Protein backbone atom coordinates (compact mmCIF):
# COMPACT_ATOMS: atom_id res chain seq x y z
CA UNK A 1 0.00 0.00 0.00
CA UNK A 2 1.37 3.42 -0.95
CA UNK A 3 0.16 6.86 0.11
CA UNK A 4 1.80 9.80 -1.64
CA UNK A 5 0.67 13.40 -1.31
CA UNK A 6 0.87 16.60 0.64
CA UNK A 7 4.61 16.26 1.02
CA UNK A 8 4.38 12.81 2.58
CA UNK A 9 5.14 9.41 1.14
CA UNK A 10 4.41 6.18 3.00
CA UNK A 11 4.95 2.63 1.77
CA UNK A 12 3.61 -0.35 3.67
CA UNK A 13 3.64 -4.03 2.78
CA UNK A 14 1.26 -6.46 4.48
CA UNK A 15 1.21 -10.24 4.29
CA UNK A 16 -2.27 -11.72 3.84
CA UNK A 17 -1.93 -15.44 4.61
CA UNK A 18 -4.27 -17.82 2.77
CA UNK A 19 -4.54 -21.39 3.97
CA UNK A 20 -6.87 -24.33 4.30
CA UNK A 21 -9.51 -24.37 7.00
CA UNK A 22 -7.62 -27.09 8.85
CA UNK A 23 -4.40 -26.83 10.87
CA UNK A 24 -1.12 -28.10 9.45
CA UNK A 25 -0.14 -31.70 10.20
CA UNK A 26 3.47 -32.67 10.88
CA UNK A 27 4.53 -36.30 10.59
CA UNK A 28 8.10 -37.37 11.14
CA UNK A 29 10.14 -40.49 11.63
CA UNK A 30 13.73 -40.92 12.75
CA UNK A 31 15.49 -44.14 11.85
CA UNK A 32 18.93 -45.67 12.22
CA UNK A 33 19.97 -47.06 8.85
CA UNK A 34 20.73 -50.74 8.39
CA UNK A 35 23.14 -51.16 5.46
CA UNK A 36 21.41 -54.43 4.49
CA UNK A 37 17.83 -53.13 4.52
CA UNK A 38 16.46 -50.69 1.93
CA UNK A 39 14.60 -47.67 3.24
CA UNK A 40 11.60 -46.07 1.60
CA UNK A 41 9.05 -43.41 2.36
CA UNK A 42 5.76 -45.02 1.36
CA UNK A 43 2.67 -43.24 0.06
CA UNK A 44 0.78 -44.30 3.19
CA UNK A 45 2.75 -41.68 5.08
CA UNK A 46 0.45 -39.06 3.50
CA UNK A 47 -2.85 -40.88 4.10
CA UNK A 48 -5.64 -38.51 5.07
CA UNK A 49 -3.85 -35.41 3.84
CA UNK A 50 -4.59 -33.10 0.90
CA UNK A 51 -2.15 -34.42 -1.77
CA UNK A 52 -1.44 -31.03 -3.37
CA UNK A 53 -0.45 -29.55 -0.02
CA UNK A 54 1.98 -32.27 1.09
CA UNK A 55 5.64 -31.28 1.43
CA UNK A 56 7.94 -34.26 1.98
CA UNK A 57 11.61 -34.24 2.90
CA UNK A 58 13.91 -37.17 3.62
CA UNK A 59 17.39 -36.50 4.98
CA UNK A 60 20.24 -38.97 5.45
CA UNK A 61 23.01 -37.64 7.64
CA UNK A 62 25.64 -38.61 10.18
CA UNK A 63 24.60 -35.57 12.23
CA UNK A 64 21.85 -35.53 14.89
CA UNK A 65 18.36 -35.09 13.37
CA UNK A 66 17.85 -31.43 14.28
CA UNK A 67 15.15 -29.98 11.95
CA UNK A 68 16.99 -26.83 10.85
CA UNK A 69 15.30 -26.74 7.44
CA UNK A 70 11.75 -27.02 8.74
CA UNK A 71 12.47 -24.49 11.50
CA UNK A 72 13.70 -21.90 8.97
CA UNK A 73 10.79 -22.62 6.64
CA UNK A 74 8.32 -22.32 9.49
CA UNK A 75 9.80 -19.00 10.60
CA UNK A 76 9.68 -17.55 7.09
CA UNK A 77 6.05 -18.57 6.61
CA UNK A 78 4.80 -17.58 10.06
CA UNK A 79 1.89 -15.18 9.44
CA UNK A 80 2.13 -12.92 12.50
CA UNK A 81 4.55 -10.16 13.42
CA UNK A 82 5.14 -9.11 17.01
CA UNK A 83 8.65 -7.88 17.82
CA UNK A 84 9.93 -11.38 18.65
CA UNK A 85 8.28 -12.95 15.59
CA UNK A 86 9.56 -10.18 13.32
CA UNK A 87 13.09 -10.76 14.60
CA UNK A 88 12.86 -14.53 14.22
CA UNK A 89 11.53 -14.19 10.66
CA UNK A 90 14.33 -11.75 9.92
CA UNK A 91 16.87 -14.22 11.30
CA UNK A 92 15.49 -16.92 9.00
CA UNK A 93 15.97 -14.66 5.98
CA UNK A 94 19.44 -13.70 7.20
CA UNK A 95 20.54 -17.32 7.56
CA UNK A 96 18.92 -18.72 4.42
CA UNK A 97 21.41 -17.57 1.80
CA UNK A 98 22.18 -19.71 -1.26
CA UNK A 99 24.91 -21.79 0.36
CA UNK A 100 22.87 -22.53 3.49
CA UNK A 101 19.81 -23.42 1.41
CA UNK A 102 21.85 -25.88 -0.65
CA UNK A 103 23.37 -27.38 2.50
CA UNK A 104 19.90 -27.95 3.99
CA UNK A 105 18.35 -29.08 0.71
CA UNK A 106 15.58 -26.46 0.74
CA UNK A 107 14.55 -23.65 -1.62
CA UNK A 108 16.41 -20.50 -0.72
CA UNK A 109 15.63 -16.82 -1.14
CA UNK A 110 17.06 -14.97 -4.10
CA UNK A 111 19.01 -11.82 -3.33
CA UNK A 112 16.08 -9.50 -4.06
CA UNK A 113 13.58 -11.35 -1.87
CA UNK A 114 16.12 -11.75 0.91
CA UNK A 115 16.90 -8.03 0.89
CA UNK A 116 13.20 -7.15 0.88
CA UNK A 117 12.54 -9.39 3.86
CA UNK A 118 15.46 -7.93 5.78
CA UNK A 119 14.44 -4.35 5.02
CA UNK A 120 10.87 -5.19 6.03
CA UNK A 121 12.12 -6.54 9.36
CA UNK A 122 14.26 -3.44 9.97
CA UNK A 123 11.36 -1.12 9.21
CA UNK A 124 8.92 -2.97 11.43
CA UNK A 125 11.34 -3.13 14.35
CA UNK A 126 12.06 0.59 13.97
CA UNK A 127 8.33 1.29 14.25
CA UNK A 128 8.20 -0.80 17.44
CA UNK A 129 11.06 0.94 19.24
CA UNK A 130 9.87 3.16 22.08
CA UNK A 131 11.53 6.24 23.52
CA UNK A 132 13.51 4.26 26.12
CA UNK A 133 15.27 2.22 23.42
CA UNK A 134 13.40 -1.00 24.23
CA UNK A 135 10.82 -2.47 21.83
CA UNK A 136 7.10 -2.83 22.31
CA UNK A 137 5.68 -6.22 21.48
CA UNK A 138 3.01 -5.01 19.06
CA UNK A 139 4.03 -1.50 18.07
CA UNK A 140 2.66 0.60 20.92
CA UNK A 141 3.59 1.19 24.54
CA UNK A 142 1.10 -1.31 25.95
CA UNK A 143 3.54 -4.18 26.50
CA UNK A 144 7.32 -3.95 26.57
CA UNK A 145 9.55 -6.93 27.32
CA UNK A 146 13.08 -5.77 28.26
CA UNK A 147 14.32 -9.35 27.91
CA UNK A 148 13.64 -9.14 24.18
CA UNK A 149 15.97 -6.21 23.49
CA UNK A 150 19.28 -8.16 23.54
CA UNK A 151 17.83 -10.64 21.02
CA UNK A 152 16.78 -7.84 18.66
CA UNK A 153 20.14 -6.09 19.00
CA UNK A 154 22.00 -9.33 18.29
CA UNK A 155 19.94 -9.74 15.11
CA UNK A 156 20.73 -6.19 14.02
CA UNK A 157 24.46 -6.71 14.67
CA UNK A 158 24.47 -10.00 12.74
CA UNK A 159 22.63 -8.35 9.85
CA UNK A 160 25.08 -5.45 9.82
CA UNK A 161 28.04 -7.84 9.76
CA UNK A 162 26.40 -9.63 6.82
CA UNK A 163 26.36 -6.37 4.85
CA UNK A 164 22.75 -5.26 5.24
CA UNK A 165 21.88 -1.59 5.76
CA UNK A 166 20.75 -1.67 9.38
CA UNK A 167 19.18 1.62 10.60
CA UNK A 168 21.96 2.96 12.78
CA UNK A 169 19.73 5.18 14.90
CA UNK A 170 17.67 2.16 15.97
CA UNK A 171 20.77 0.11 16.73
CA UNK A 172 22.57 2.84 18.69
CA UNK A 173 19.47 3.69 20.72
CA UNK A 174 19.02 0.03 21.69
CA UNK A 175 22.71 -0.39 22.54
CA UNK A 176 22.57 2.67 24.78
CA UNK A 177 19.53 1.22 26.54
CA UNK A 178 21.30 -2.10 27.14
CA UNK A 179 24.36 -0.31 28.49
CA UNK A 180 22.34 1.83 30.89
CA UNK A 181 20.29 -1.14 32.10
CA UNK A 182 23.37 -3.27 32.67
CA UNK A 183 25.04 -0.57 34.77
CA UNK A 184 21.82 0.02 36.72
CA UNK A 185 21.22 -3.65 37.53
CA UNK A 186 18.98 -4.60 34.64
CA UNK A 187 15.27 -5.41 34.45
CA UNK A 188 13.92 -6.76 37.73
CA UNK A 189 11.26 -9.19 36.42
CA UNK A 190 9.01 -8.59 39.40
CA UNK A 191 6.19 -11.12 39.66
CA UNK A 192 7.93 -13.68 37.43
CA UNK A 193 8.76 -17.24 38.35
CA UNK A 194 12.52 -17.85 38.64
CA UNK A 195 12.99 -14.09 38.90
CA UNK A 196 16.67 -14.16 39.89
CA UNK A 197 17.52 -16.50 37.04
CA UNK A 198 15.69 -14.32 34.51
CA UNK A 199 17.44 -11.22 35.80
CA UNK A 200 20.88 -12.86 35.57
CA UNK A 201 20.16 -14.34 32.14
CA UNK A 202 19.04 -10.97 30.79
CA UNK A 203 22.12 -9.18 32.16
CA UNK A 204 24.45 -11.86 30.80
CA UNK A 205 22.82 -11.70 27.36
CA UNK A 206 23.02 -7.90 27.34
CA UNK A 207 26.68 -8.08 28.38
CA UNK A 208 27.42 -10.53 25.57
CA UNK A 209 25.73 -8.33 22.96
CA UNK A 210 27.49 -5.20 24.21
CA UNK A 211 30.85 -6.99 24.21
CA UNK A 212 30.50 -7.53 20.47
CA UNK A 213 30.93 -3.78 20.02
CA UNK A 214 33.38 -3.42 22.94
CA UNK A 215 30.85 -1.59 25.10
CA UNK A 216 30.32 -4.02 28.00
CA UNK A 217 31.71 -2.64 31.31
CA UNK A 218 34.27 -5.17 32.52
CA UNK A 219 33.74 -4.37 36.20
CA UNK A 220 30.02 -5.10 35.91
CA UNK A 221 30.69 -8.38 34.10
CA UNK A 222 33.15 -9.43 36.80
CA UNK A 223 30.65 -8.58 39.54
CA UNK A 224 28.00 -10.65 37.77
CA UNK A 225 30.30 -13.65 37.63
CA UNK A 226 31.71 -13.31 41.14
CA UNK A 227 28.46 -12.56 42.96
CA UNK A 228 25.50 -13.78 40.91
CA UNK A 229 26.48 -16.74 38.76
CA UNK A 230 24.75 -19.06 41.21
CA UNK A 231 21.42 -17.56 40.13
CA UNK A 232 21.70 -19.17 36.69
CA UNK A 233 19.54 -22.28 36.40
CA UNK A 234 20.72 -23.14 32.88
CA UNK A 235 24.01 -23.11 31.02
CA UNK A 236 23.42 -20.54 28.29
CA UNK A 237 23.59 -17.40 30.49
CA UNK A 238 26.96 -18.55 31.85
CA UNK A 239 28.21 -19.07 28.29
CA UNK A 240 26.97 -15.61 27.30
CA UNK A 241 28.72 -14.11 30.31
CA UNK A 242 31.90 -16.09 29.65
CA UNK A 243 32.12 -14.88 26.06
CA UNK A 244 31.50 -11.30 27.20
CA UNK A 245 34.23 -11.52 29.84
CA UNK A 246 36.69 -12.99 27.34
CA UNK A 247 35.94 -10.38 24.69
CA UNK A 248 36.36 -7.56 27.22
CA UNK A 249 39.74 -8.90 28.36
CA UNK A 250 39.16 -11.20 31.36
CA UNK A 251 39.90 -14.53 29.74
CA UNK A 252 40.36 -16.42 33.03
CA UNK A 253 36.88 -15.67 34.34
CA UNK A 254 35.53 -16.05 30.82
CA UNK A 255 36.93 -19.55 30.47
CA UNK A 256 35.62 -20.59 33.87
CA UNK A 257 32.16 -19.24 33.14
CA UNK A 258 31.98 -21.06 29.81
CA UNK A 259 33.16 -24.31 31.41
CA UNK A 260 30.51 -23.97 34.12
CA UNK A 261 27.86 -23.45 31.46
Descriptions of predicted regions:
Residues 120, 256-259:
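Primarily a tetratricopeptide repeat
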Residues 1-197, 203-225, 240, 244:
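Extended, solvent-exposed functional surface patches
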Residues 223-234, 261:
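Solenoid-like repeat scaffolds
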